[in-house]
């Protein structure tokens, strides 16, 4: 019973050695090493600023920065926040003034409309 197990272990070891030797041969080629370095440098390179403001499909896929910002809508810049307006001591009096101004402005417009309608009605009666 010990012999089949030893045979399996030896076959596994030989296959591991064979696979590791293949991967070492592939990694040792100078072309693949330079290609890997180039890919890694592109991966860790910061995104270049692109000032194109067009949102068409072609411009959205122009570069990685445009795709993230325009295509996906992801923006890592700090959001501008509005400063809170200074509140006055008498907020109720300020709101009363604005309401009274609104009421004053609306009333004359209604009167003008009524007078225009009355003139039009009298003109139609005379023409017939």
From Swiss-Prot:
BP term (GO), one: positive regulation of viral transcription
Domain of life: Viruses
Motif Nuclear localization signal, and RNA-binding (TAR): positions: 78-82
Region named Disordered: 1-34, 79-128
Biased composition annotated in UniProt, kind: Acidic residues: 25-34
Listed Basic and acidic residues bias regions: 1-19
Subcellular location: Host nucleus, Host nucleolus
Gene Ontology molecular-function annotations: RNA binding; RNA-binding transcription regulator activity
InterPro entries according to UniProt: IV_Tat, Tat_dom_sf
Principal place of residence: host cell
Region (Cysteine-rich): 50-66
Family the entry assigns: Belongs to the lentiviruses Tat family.
Subunit structure: Interacts with host CCNT1. Associates with the P-TEFb complex composed at least of Tat, P-TEFb (CDK9 and CCNT1), TAR RNA, RNA Pol II. Interacts with CCNT2; the resulting complex is unable to bind to TAR RNA.
Protein's recorded name: Protein Tat
Organism from which the protein derives: Simian immunodeficiency virus (isolate PBj14/BCL-3)
Lineage: Viruses, Riboviria, Pararnavirae, Artverviricota, Revtraviricetes
Gene symbol of the encoding locus: tat
